[in-house]
């Protein structure tokens, strides 16, 4: 009787889930919710610009506040703009990696309608591509290059947001895979699925 030996073969394990801790602060457009830290413009040096942002399950892009006349430095802090190079900026400061794409309409949340509008200017933003990292800037932060970042100047988008929608987005003829697609393609996560809890201040 032939004896079959078990073939020794090691199958690669899928990547473990990547866990992003909340910022430890509560911010929001319509209340106080858990925010999460992201960094923009880093090149594995720990010198990126940090932002506290809300999570958007319907948005495909990263949206962050830009400097505007109606929001001073104290206001910018409440919009999630963190201290950068020892100073409080009023919005995103374009990094050496920033590439301008143009001014286009911002993606609106699935629940949005005109009755929510508080700013009568149009909802366009300055689109560009830059490096986007998870968590506060550090040499351990996972960073993806060539990600769409939208700079918003309108009060309707008071806080920035980190989009988790899968697929591609961008101006006509300039679509790029979204962050979660690129994160999956770089073998840093096992699938394009995610779990998320929006902690509220009153439930502390």
List the predicted regions and their residue ranges:
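Aspartyl protease catalytic domain
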Residues: 1-29, 133-204
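Signature of the N-terminal lobe/flap region of pepsin-like aspartyl proteases
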Residues: 20, 28-147
